[in-house]
Amino acid sequence: MFDQLAVFTPQGQVLYQYNCLGKKFSEIQINSFISQLITSPVTRKESVANANTDGFDFNLLTINSEHKNSPSFNALFYLNKQPELYFVVTFAEQTLELNQETQQTLALVLKLWNSLHLSESILKNRQGQNEKNKHNYVDILQGIEDDLKKFEQYFRIKYEESIKQDHINPDNFTKNGSVPQSHNKNTKKKLRDTKGKKQSTGNVGSGRKWGRDGGMLDEMNHEDAAKLDFSSSNSHNSSQVALDSTINKDSFGDRTEGGDFLIKEIDDLLSSHKDEITSGNEAKNSGYVSTAFGFLQKHVLGNKTINESDLKSVLEKLTQQLITKNVAPEAADYLTQQVSHDLVGSKTANWTSVENTARESLTKALTQILTPGVSVDLLREIQSKRSKKDEEGKCDPYVFSIVGVNGVGKSTNLSKLAFWLLQNNFKVLIVACDTFRSGAVEQLRVHVENLAQLMDDSHVRGSKNKRGKTGNDYVELFEAGYGGSDLVTKIAKQAIKYSRDQNFDIVLMDTAGRRHNDPTLMSPLKSFADQAKPDKIIMVGEALVGTDSVQQAKNFNDAFGKGRNLDFFIISKCDTVGEMLGTMVNMVYATGIPILFVGVGQTYTDLRTLSVKWAVNTLMS
C-alpha cells in the first residue's frame, strides 16, 4: 500500500494528512518532495493519465532523499490551479500494483474534494468574500471545518472499501493491515497455545519426518507439528475468517444522533458532483459542430417556441437511449410523453437547444418516478408500532413478508435486511415460510447462524438458544419443515404469536419463489396476506431481468387482492448490470411502488438506499 497522503498549499499549510499504516505523519517526505519540485520542476517530471486516473492528469516524481531517516520514494501528485493546492500520494517503489493503487487513491481524493466544493470555499476565503474573524483576518479554512471532517471520514471509508481491499496482499498483511512480523508473532503465540492444548489432551510425543525410502529423517518439535494441525481450533478460526468476509460494517452506514443506523450514500455525493460536471459539459458541447452555421443555430434559435415537430426526432432518440438501458418500451413511451406535455408550447431558454431542453425535462421525469421515501421513515414506523402495548403489556411485532420470482435473491436480501434491522437494535425473528424449495430452510439456518455470530462472538455455530431454536438473543429462526400452501399460512400465524410472546421486534417471513405468469402459483399469495397480515410486503426484483420486470411487478402487486398491494421493492444484483438500470424505472412505473434498497453484492453490508441522482445520471449518460 502507499505511504502517505497530503493536501497542502504552496505556502506549506497542510490541509489534510493521512498515513496509511497509522504511523506518525512524516513531514520529511513532504519537505523532500517540495525541495525536489523546486530544484527540478520539469526534467524529473512524468505525466500520468490512464483509466485509473479518472480523467485527471497526474505527475510522478522519484525523490532520492538526503535524509537518513527517509529513504528514496516516489510521489504521485496533482496541482490544482484555483486555488493553488498540491495533492500528493507517496509510495516506496514503482510496481504495477502500487502504481494502480496510488492512481486510484489520488483520483478518489480529488473526486471527494471537488464533490464537497472545498476548493470553491477556500477560494472565497482567499478573496475575502467570507466573514472575517476577530483579528480582521479571513483564514482559508474558515467555515469549512465540518466539510474537511466529512472529507476525512468519506475518504477513509471509500479507500478501505473499494481500493485497499482490492490491492492488499493477504500473504503480506493481516486483516487489520499489520505487517508480516507482527503476524508471525501472533502466529507463534497461537502455536504455543495449541501446543499446550495438545499436551493436555495426551498428545505428548514428538512428531517424525519420513524420507522417501521409509526411513525416519528426524524428530519434529511441537511447533512444527502445530503448523500441520488443522483440527477444531484452527477450523474455528477459518470459519471466523469466512464469516468476517460476509460483512464490512465500516462501509455499511453510520448512526445518526438519534441512534438510527442508516445505509451509507457516499456514492450519491460523488455521482451528484459527476452529474454537475456532465451537465456542464453537455451544455458546452450540445452536439453542434464548431462551424459558423452551428454557432448561429445554437445562439440565434434559442428562446424559440417548441412544437411537436421540433420534438419528434429528439424524443425518438431519447426513447431509443432509454430502451438500450433496459427501460421497457411502454415505460420509455410514457416518459417521453411526459416530456412532450411538459415542453410543447413552452420556449427554450437563451442559448439552449431543443434537444438539451428535452434532456432536462426527461431528467426531471425520471427523477419524479424514482423519488420515494428513505430508510429512516421505515424505522420510525417500526418504533411507533413497538411503542404501543396492549392490556397484558405486550407489543405486536412489525411483520415483513418477502416475495418475488425464483432465483432473484429473496433469502439473501432478507438476511441483509435482517442485519440492517439488527444494527438498529431490533430483535429479529426470521421465519422459514418457503416450504416448497428443497434446502430453503437450511439456507436460512446458515444465514441465522452467521447473523447470530456477528452479533455475539461467543455464539457457537450449531448450538441452540435457551428456547431450543437456532440463533441467540438477537436473531432466531422459526421453522416447521416442508409442506403445502396450508402449512405456509399456519407457520406464519404461529410465528407471529410466538414473536409476540417472546417479545421480538421484527418478523421477517421468507416465502417461496414463484413464476409471475402462473396463476396457480400466484393465487396462494392472497390467502397468505389475509392470514398473516404483514405490515410491509417487499418484492425482490433483480436488475438483470430487463423489460419483463414490468409484468412481474404488476402481477405481484395485483396478487394480494383489492386493498392490499406491495409496499416496497428491493432491486438485487445492481452491481452486475453497469449502466443498464432500466429495471428500476420499469418496476416503479408499473406500480408506483418505491424502491427501499438496492443490492450491490453478496455480503450482508451490500445494501444501499437508492441514489436517485446516480440512477438518473446513469440512465441519461
Curated annotation (Swiss-Prot):
CDD domains: longin-like, SRalpha_C. It is a peripheral membrane protein. Residues 167-217 are annotated as: Disordered. Its main location: endoplasmic reticulum. SUPFAM superfamilies: Domain of the SRP/SRP receptor G-proteins, P-loop containing nucleoside triphosphate hydrolases, SNARE-like. Keywords: Endoplasmic reticulum, GTP-binding, Membrane, Nucleotide-binding, Phosphoprotein, Receptor. GO terms for cellular component: endoplasmic reticulum; endoplasmic reticulum membrane; membrane; signal recognition particle receptor complex. The keyword Nucleotide-binding applies. The modification Phosphoserine is found at S239, S523. GO terms for molecular function: ATP hydrolysis activity; GTP binding; GTPase activity; signal recognition particle binding. Residues 171-183 have a biased composition (Polar residues). It is found in: Endoplasmic reticulum membrane. The keyword Phosphoprotein applies. GTP binds at residues 404-411, 510-514, 572-575. Residues 398-620 are annotated as: NG domain. InterPro entries: AAA+_ATPase, Longin-like_dom_sf, P-loop_NTPase, Signal_recog_particl_SRP54_hlx, SRP/SRP_N, SRP54_GTPase_dom, SRP54_N_sf, SRX_dom. Residues 185-198 have a biased composition (Basic residues). Residues 1-158 are annotated as: SRX. GO terms for biological process: protein targeting to ER; SRP-dependent cotranslational protein targeting to membrane, signal sequence recognition. Present with 2000 molecules/cell in log phase SD medium. Heterodimer of an alpha and a beta chain. Belongs to the GTP-binding SRP family. Component of the SRP (signal recognition particle) receptor (SR). Ensures, in conjunction with the signal recognition particle, the correct targeting of the nascent secretory proteins to the endoplasmic reticulum membrane system. GTP hydrolysis may enhance the fidelity of and provide unidirectionality to the targeting reaction. It is important but not essential for cell growth. May be directly involved in mitochondrial protein import. The SRX domain is sufficient for interaction with GTP-bound SRP102/SR-beta. This is Signal recognition particle receptor subunit alpha homolog.
